[in-house]
Curated annotation (Swiss-Prot):
This is Crossover junction endodeoxyribonuclease RuvC. It is an enzyme of class 3 (hydrolase). Belongs to the RuvC family. It comes from Acaryochloris marina (strain MBIC 11017). The lineage of its organism: Bacteria, Bacillati, Cyanobacteriota, Cyanophyceae, Acaryochloridales. Mg(2+) 1 binds at D9, D141.
Length: 156
């Protein structure tokens, strides 16, 4: 059975997405990228951009399931902004009635590298290896989203 998995790495400035398609043990990369919002734009407008662009990603790819990185608290100011963007993401996913799977950063690192405290490069190398890419996926937020999608595939 074919299954499309959308991985999301929520953020306000840059929201990463990655879409993979799985069939049995076969894995195919369909798309990846970022939804970017301008820094000097009103927060409401930035959230609206995420809302509209994520709807477009969902309508284009029509995933069966969405895997999303759980919110990680590290700097209060940034965490609040990410939480606002994440709220919009969850709203859009609910509107599309999509099942959601959430993973912590440590779970994602462990699934891809075997080490829950792996660095970003190790995770990107694992993503590139699993998806047979010639180079590391960029930008970082898109690579992180692919890592989330792959984690969902590994955990099936």
């Amino acid at each position: 059975m074919t299954k499309k998995i959308l991985g999301l790495d929520p953020g306000l400035a840059s929201l990463g997405f990655g879409v993979i398609c799985t069939e049995s043990d076969n894995l195919e990369l369909l798309d990846f990228g970022i939804i970017q919002t301008p820094a000097k734009t009103d927060i409401g407008k930035r959230l609206q951009i995420i809302y509209e662009d994520l709807h477009q990603v969902l309508n284009t790819h029509q995933p069966d399931v969405v895997a999303i990185e759980k919110l990680f608290f590290y700097r209060m100011g940034n965490t609040i902004l990410v939480a606002q963007a994440r709220g919009v993401v969850l709203l859009v996913l609910a509107q599309h009635q999509l099942p959601i799977i959430e993973y912590t950063p440590a779970q994602i690192k462990l699934a891809l590298t075997g080490y829950g405290a792996a660095d970003k490069v190790a995770v990107q190398e694992a993503v590139a290896r699993e998806l047979c890419l010639d180079c590391l996926p960029r930008p970082d937020d898109a690579a992180d989203a692919l890592a989330v999608a792959l984690t969902a595939w590994f955990q099936r």
